[in-house]
Each structure stands twice: as structure tokens, then as C-alpha cells.
Amino acid sequence: MKKALATILALVMAIGLCSVSWATDPAATQVTETTEVLDNGSYIVNGEVTLTGGALTVKPGAAVTLELAAGSKLTNKAGSHTIINNGNLTITGTGTVDNVSHGCAALYNAPGATATLNGGTFDRSHEAGASTGNNGGNSYYTIKNFGTITVNPGVTVQQDGTANGGTTGKYSSLFANGWYDITTAGQPGKEPAHSSDAVLVINGGTFKGGLNTVKNDDAGKLTINDGTFTNIAQHAVFNVNEATIKGGNYTMSGNDSVLYNRKYDDANDKGQMTIENGVFKAKDGVPAIKIADENSKPSVTGGTFSSDVRAYAAGDTPVAATGEQEGTYVVGQSAINAVAKAGNNVRIVKGNVTLTDVPAGVTVIPGEGTVVFVNGKDISGNQYSDGYTVPQSSGYYYYQPTTDTKTDNTKGSPKTFDAGIALYVGMALTSAAGVAFVGKKRED
């Protein structure tokens, strides 16, 4: 029996080790240096392939699956995009799509085209953008979208020219969705004509660098459900049209805000930003959200922020301050309750909340004009303006007879129960009011 079990386990392990190679389509066509056009079917990149005939181009109407095999790298022909999609493209695998030329993208998704990214790293390994006014002689978006793109977990998009004397992107954005200037779309030498909006859905992945990590531009529609976004230059998300953020982690380690929102008009630059969830961290003293003017306010219904965002909280949505020096702001009833339940002190700065299962020792401070219940107790009003601390429970006492005799000939003592207090480490970033950015949007 033991031998049979060992054999079965060995077979299971072998299947697991082979599963990656089995995932490769044996009928897939190998992409070579001279491959230029992809028609219906499956293709695979193995090893390092530098294109010589031009961009790897998906034909209009074609349904193509492109696998980036482990360790593979697809590099552009000088002066060309690496991949141009005019059809329906799905990319899988763990390899890399790179672009090393000025003004060229690793992936260019044309108007009307659809791309689904299920894996791979997309890079500009010679990115040299030095500042908003200096492209360093080699800069562009890593991905440019005029069609529809869905990004799923397992994808990495970056601008990392540091190994080649470059930068992580300070001139061009990393991922651009929509038109830079839709008023000139379709004109000779300009961006393609606008027939339908550019749609970008991000379900996960890692996005690093760029002047703006994700730029939602003219006629762009952006939805972010999850992902990790890091920026050191300007903003993690820059929006001028329609953006909905439902989750993800966003970090800005430079001297600007995590999010930026601006409205230009009611047609293609609506400046509509809705934030339902996510964690947004800027440097100490830097606002998490910056807006161009009062017409550009986002609508915040959830999330955790490193600065005060109550001015953007939709309607009566509650907001609480917590963490060291109350530098973290939590938005939404359920999120605030979770923080207090985890053992954090909170100050309710806006709205009405009902907190339940808050452990002993936690202090809740009701702000002016708020209505706050803690474990069923109404602490609203001036009586608790300095805070209400949840008292220790009287505990539960029960007697259990025992015949056990201890070494000192005494019986076992009664037992008591004391609910412990969970510890939670909050964000420790100091909030600061944002300075409105009123200049015309920088290229990218």
C-alpha cells in the first residue's frame, strides 16, 4: 500500500512539474526575426528574437494567441513598435516584450482592436526620459491604447532603462489610454481618427514608472479593479475623462500626488473619477489626491488614503482619521468598522457610522456634526468630544467542579475569560492639503 501511495504521489508531482510545458500549444507557429504578420492562429516566442522586418503586426479581424515562453524576449526593429495589434490579440506566458527605440511602444493597440494580456512583461529597456521637458533622446509609452485592452494578474508593465544608463520614465507616461489631443485626431501626421472610445480594464498586475503610471487621456475609459502601481515622477493615475478605481495599491514616492483629476469639457475630457476602494500612499506632507479646480472633484466612496480626503467623499459617506498622528484617512462604513474592530483608535471626521464588535481599549472620537454609535452606545454630541474608550468587559465567570488536586492540595481555581485586543499597524503618513495644479496637462 505504501509503495502504491508513493507511486501516486510521484506521478502527481511529475504532472505538476510538467504542467507548464504542457500549456504550450504544440501547433503554435514560431516567431522569428523575419516574422511580420500574424493571422488567425497561435504563435510562440522562444529565446531572444529581435525583429528585422518591422513591427509584429496582427491583421485586422484576425484572432491571435501569442505565447511568450519562459525566458523569451521579443525586441523591436529599430524605429518600429514591437507589436501592433489591429485584430483580437491574447498574450500569455512569462517572457518579455521590449522596445528600445524613441517614440515607439512595446505594444500599440490600434482603434477597434482588442487585446487581452494574461501574462508577460512589457518594457522599454532604454527609456531615457529625464524630466517633463527632456526626453533624453529615447522616450515613449510602454503601451499605447486606442482600442480595448484588458490586463489580468501576472502582467508587468514598466519603463526601466536603468541598466542601460536611462531612467524609469520621467517624460512619457507608462500606460496611455486614449488620445493626447483628440481635436487633431485623423489629421496627417497626427493620431488616428476617433470612432469609438479607448477602453482599459485592469484586473491586476504590476505597473512601475513613467511620468504618469497610468494616463487616462481624451476619450479614455478606465476601470481599475486591482493591481500594484508605483511612481516617482508625477502621478500613479492621471485622469481627464472617465475613470473608476475599485481597488489596488498605489504608491507615489516623489513629490506629487498619487491621483490627479482634471475636467476640460463635457465631451471627451469629462474629468469624472470615482474611487470605490484601494490604498493610496503619498509622501509625508503630499496630498493623495490633487485636482485642477473645483469642477474636477472626484467622488470617493471607499479606500484608505495618506491625507484628508473628506472634501471628496460623496454625499454623506463617512470618513475617519486613524493611525499615528491621525495621518491615515479611511472612507466608508465597512472600512471604518474594520479598522476600529482591529484595535485602532479612530476619529470620525465626516458622516454617520455604527461601529460594532469594537474591542476594549479602543477610543472613538465623534467629530462635530457626526452621529456615532459604538457597540450600541450613542456617543454623539459634546459629552464625548474628547473621545469614548470602550470599557473592559466584566468578563465571563463560570465554575467547573474538579477532583484534580494540585501539589499544594488545593482544588483547581475558577476560570475567567478576557477578550484580547487585536493590534493593528496603521499607515503613518501626515496629511496635507493639495495645491491645485492648473497648468495644461503635460504630454504624458
Describe the role of every protein-language-model region.
Residues 290-302, 309, 356-379:
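Extracellular, surface-exposed repeat/solenoid domains
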Residues 26-37, 233, 309, 334-344, ...:
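Disulfide-bonded cysteine-rich modules in secreted/extracellular proteins
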Residues 40, 57-70, 84-99, 106-126, ...:
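Surface-exposed loop/turn motifs in large extracellular/passenger domains
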Residues 419-441:
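A cross-kingdom C-terminal cell-surface attachment/processing module
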Residues 380-416:
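C-terminal low-complexity, Ser/Thr- and acidic/Pro-rich disordered "stalk" regions positioned immediately N-terminal
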